[in-house]
Design a protein with these regions (language model features):
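Short, flexible helix-loop junctions that flank or precede catalytic/ligand sites
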Residues: 1-369
Length: 369
C-alpha cells in the first residue's frame, strides 16, 4: 500500500504550501509557487489513488456519501502536529487530491506587512471589513492574524464561520467560538450560521468567505445592527468588491443596498502575493479606508473603477493606499523586482508605475542633497 503519510511529511519538511496527488503522476509539491515533483517514489497508480481515498475518508460513510453526491469534499487532517486542508475532487472519474499545509503557528499581524491603520480599523466596535484577493493571496492568513490580534488585545466574543477551520485559536483576552460550515458540521451554510450568530451575543463575526446574496444579506444586517463583521471575498480590488456585492442584487434593489454598504463598510484590504527578490512571497495590498467621500461614491447611481482608484490615491493621509503605490514601495525597498511589479499591470499601469518610481527616486535624491 502507498505510504501517504510519507508523502505528506516529505512535503511538509520541504516547506511546500500545497501537495497535489493525481493518477499517473508523482506527487507534486508547490514550493514558493513552483511545482516540483517528488522523485523518491514512482508515478501513482489507480490502486494508489484509491488507497489514498480510503486513507482520507477512513471508512466514514458520511464523508463518502457527501463525495458521491457533491463530487467534491473538503476535510481537515492532522499529522505530526501539522494541519492540512484536503480537497478531493474528480478527474476522469478518479479522485484528485489537493492538500494545503496550514502552518501550526498562528499568524502575527506584525509579520503581514500591512500598515497599522488596518489594526486600528479592526478595533472598531461595528461595521464591515473585507479582506479580498484571488486564490492563494493570503486572505486566510490576514483574517486569522486579525483574529489573533483582537484575541490578545480586546475583551470581545468572537464567532468565526469557516469552511474548513484552518487555524485553531485558543481564547485569550477574548472568548473565541469557531464553527465549521458544511453539511453535517457545526452549521449547514454561512448564511444559516450568521442568522444564528444574531442570537449568540457575539461582538465580532468572522466569515470565512462571502460568495452569495444570502451571506452578504445577513452580513450587512449584522454590521448594521451594531456588530463588527470581518469577511473575505474572491475579488482583486476595492472597486471590484463593491461591484460584486451590488451584482448579487436586482437593479431595483441596488440603490437601497448602496446606502447600506456605504454606511457600514469601513475598509477593503485587497491583497496579492508577488514573487520577491529573496525567493519569498511579498504581500502587496490595496487598502481602501472608507470616509465620507468614498461613501458618497458608493451611493452614486453609477461610479467607475477609476473614481474609486483616484479616491484611494488621494486619501493616503487617511490610511488608504493604491495598489500601484504599494508596488512602487515594494520596488523601492527592493523587496520585489521591477519586472515582477510590471507583470501585475497593463501598459497604462506600467507607464504610471515608471512615472511614480521616477518621482519617488527624485524625492529621495533631493532629501539627500
Amino acid at each position: 500500500m502507498i505510504d501517504i503519510e510519507s508523502i505528506l511529511m516529505n512535503g511538509i519538511n520541504k516547506g511546500a504550501s500545497d501537495i497535489h496527488i493525481v493518477e499517473n503522476k508523482k506527487p507534486i509539491f508547490r514550493i514558493n509557487r513552483i511545482l516540483t515533483e517528488m522523485n523518491e517514489i514512482p508515478e501513482l497508480t489507480r490502486k494508489d489513488i484509491l488507497d489514498i481515498y480510503e486513507f482520507f475518508t477512513n471508512g466514514n460513510e458520511g464523508l463518502r456519501s457527501e463525495f458521491n453526491e457533491e463530487k467534491r469534499l473538503d476535510l481537515n487532517f492532522e499529522i505530526a502536529g501539522a494541519r492540512l486542508r484536503v480537497n478531493v475532487s474528480l478527474s476522469n472519474n478518479v479522485p484528485v487530491f489537493t492538500a494545503r499545509i496550514i502552518k501550526s503557528e498562528l499568524p502575527q499581524f506584525k509579520n503581514l506587512g500591512l500598515p497599522d491603520v488596518v489594526r486600528k480599523i479592526a478595533s472598531l466596535p461595528q461595521g464591515l471589513i473585507l479582506v479580498t484577493g484571488k486564490s492563494n493571496s493570503g486572505k486566510s492568513t490576514t483574517l486569522n492574524a486579525l483574529i489573533n490580534e483582537i484575541n490578545h488585545t480586546e475583551n470581545k466574543k468572537i464567532l468565526t464561520l469557516e469552511n474548513p477551520i484552518e487555524f485553531v485559536h485558543q481564547s485569550e483576552k477574548s472568548l473565541i467560538v469557531q464553527k465549521e460550515v458544511g453539511e453535517g458540521r457545526d452549521c449547514n451554510s454561512f448564511s444559516a450560521g450568521i442568522i444564528n450568530a444574531l442570537r449568540e451575543d457575539c461582538d465580532i463575526l468572522v466569515i470565512g468567505e462571502i460568495r452569495d446574496k444570502e451571506t452578504i444579506d445577513v452580513a450587512l444586517e449584522m454590521a448594521e445592527s451594531g456588530h463588527l463583521v470581518i469577511g473575505t471575498m474572491h475579488t482583486k480590488s476595492a472597486s471590484e468588491t463593491i461591484d460584486r456585492i451590488l451584482g448579487f442584487y436586482d437593479l431595483s434593489d441596488q440603490l437601497t443596498v448602496k446606502y447600506m454598504v456605504s454606511s457600514v463598510l469601513k475598509a477593503v484590504i485587497s491583497q496579492r502575493l508577488i514573487n520577491g527578490n529573496d525567493d519569498d512571497l511579498v504581500m502587496v495590498p490595496e487598502i481602501m479606508i472608507v470616509d465620507d467621500t468614498i461613501s458618497g461614491l458608493i451611493r452614486k447611481e453609477k461610479f467607475s473603477k477609476s473614481e474609486i482608484e483616484d479616491a484611494i490615491q488621494t486619501r493616503m493621509e487617511k490610511g488608504s493606499i493604491s495598489f500601484i503605490n504599494s508596488l512602487a514601495n515594494a520596488v523601492i525597498s527592493r523587496r520585489i523586482s521591477l519586472y515582477q511589479a510590471k507583470k501585475q499591470l497593463d501598459d497604462a499601469g506600467c507607464e504610471n508605475l515608471t512615472r511614480l518610481l521616477n518621482q519617488m527616486n527624485e524625492r529621495k535624491l533631493n532629501s539627500i542633497v
